[in-house]
Amino acid sequence: QEQVCAGICESVTLSRFENGKQTPSRNRINAILQRLGLPDDRYYALVTPEELEIEALKKEIVSCNALKCVEDGFDKISQLEKIVKPDDQITQQFILRSKVLLGGLDKRYSNDERIQMLVQAIRMTIPNFQLDKIEDFLFTLDEMKLVNQIGNAYSLSGDNEKAADIFYRLLQYIRRHLPETVTSNRMLPLVLYNFARSLDLSQKYEEGAKVARCGKEACIKYGHYQVLHSCLEIEAECDFFLGKKEESVERY
């Protein structure tokens, strides 16, 4: 119970939610369901005008990141910082994670700074988080994204061995805790691709090709095609270095 509600609410508050004595906010119930490995899109909840404003700004920030509109994104973050409550750790975590993503586009943070900021963000809701014990915790979708970002930050710094270990541990967590949930379906292909890429960059071509194939299969199985071409590219490159040139040409 402590792991489920850590950084989200107190244990006694969770009990009140369970007994119907208190109604949770939408972002809190989403986070709790995600940590339990349950779908977060099968219920209805009333939201306040403040919650609607926060959600709208979060969507705009995500859009700015996708469109690489860095300055607009930081302007939206400033607006969000003015209305979010200090004890809303979930939104505070989103803000810090978004700063790292947007800041990565214009290189305003070094790799070390990015790693420090990402670890700080995840410890807002998981105070005892350790990279070598990833499988010991329960994660929300945003927390899984943070772990994924930390792995990418290590890869960008050139430490692909460390990155591969992070992706491996996150992959084990997803497979064990979230076998068929929507949350898992969204994360699985992405983590498999990043894991395969780190193995490829570590010159572990046989393992990299195998993981890339798993990523390709996950994309097709769950209908998430954003990294399908990237998985094919990694598989092709690994095949090339393994001397399988005909297979490599076919993948490309």
Regions found by a protein language model. Give the residues of each.
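Amphipathic alpha-helical segments of tetratricopeptide repeats
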Residues: I77-K85, V119-D132, Y168-P179, A212-H224
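Residue-level signature for tetratricopeptide repeat
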Residues: K59, S63-C64, S98-L105, A153-L156, ...
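Structural signature of alpha-solenoid helical repeat junctions
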Residues: L52, T91, E135-D142, E180-M187, ...
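Structural motif corresponding to the intra-repeat A-B loop/turn of tetratricopeptide repeats
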Residues: L67, D106-R108, S157, F195, ...
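Short alpha-helical DNA-recognition segment
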Residues: Q1-R16
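"A position-specific structural signal for the A-helix of alpha-solenoid helical repeats
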Residues: E55, K59-V62, T91-L102, D142, ...
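DNA major-groove recognition helix of helix-turn-helix/homeodomain DNA-binding modules
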Residues: N27-R42
